[in-house]
Amino acid sequence: MELTIEKAIQQAVAEHKKGNLQKAESAYRQVLKVMPAHAAANHNLGILLVDLYQSNNGLKFLHAALQGNQKVEQFWLSYINALINLDKLDIANEFIGAARKAGFSGPKFASLSERMLSPVELRAKGKFFQANDVNYLHFLRALHRNVYEGYFEIGTRTGASLVLSQSPSIAIDPFFQLSENPIGNKDFCLMFQETSDSFFENRLPKLSGLKCQLAFIDGMHLFEYALKDFINLAKISSEEALFLFHDPIPWTFKMATRNNEMLERNEAWTGDIWKLVHILIDAGMKDNVNLLSSAPSGLLAVLNPDKKIIAKLEKNYDKICAQWLDVELNEDNLLKFYETGVFVKPEVYLQSLEQISFGNRKANISKDWISQ
């Protein structure tokens, strides 16, 4: 029987590594039906749920793994990591102390302790805040459990993010390099191979009834383009809408440059998307803005922006661009960025969306969504 269990674990791990998460979850749960205290199955299922932004569900399995075998360092690390994801910092600190008493310490535990520091506290130690929570694509996958009135994506490239959507979708990219079929379970998906400026100027007037309830903006890595895309999308947004910008959290000064030719080949580049945080806060959106620490370079989330503020941003667009164009990310500006106080754990943010039932209503798709 033990061999059968171990074979089942191996198969589950293989599916997990391939990214077949539903099959892996089912296999782990089958093992736990037979052996509820199986430490590896509990641990791996917990990790899988954490990767799916379900740390609350994963905690009990990670805790069961730790209770089953406290001699495995990774069981301590995984449980503490899940607690930090949920901002349960006091409990996480208690378990770091317990791990030390059990004989575990070293750089991995030091790294977990650093994850509990605020950006300002980290900078006081001479370190950058790094977005090292679960990957942003997993965050998007969690959002796309719901169906939205309309999903817009600017900067689709390979389609890795677009494929996650189950909603009627619009994708815009000047040069698609799709690696898989993006249609999936969507009722439809319109793809426009052009710049976003061209789309909003030439295509949008020919389309009727478009509503943007969820948007992912991952285009030029330059603030003025992202700001213009945001303004254009917000003008056709639903009453409740969420906008996500990729790459707002650089972890070096160099990667925040506007000129990516200054970087080495394959060196990470966020551009100056970070400026949008200040621009939107200055415009009066602090209550709508959050920075999510989804790896590798974060997400800027803007929830339910005020249409009056959007109109002011559009009116003052040239002035705002002139004001911010030559601003660089130096030590003073980095600290001001960290002091905005809008950083939040992505899983905590997801929970806040669930509390207000954002996106929990099925999309009402009209056949007139596209003009004839």
What is each stretch, according to the model?
Residues 3-34:
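Alpha-helical segment of the N-proximal tetratricopeptide repeat
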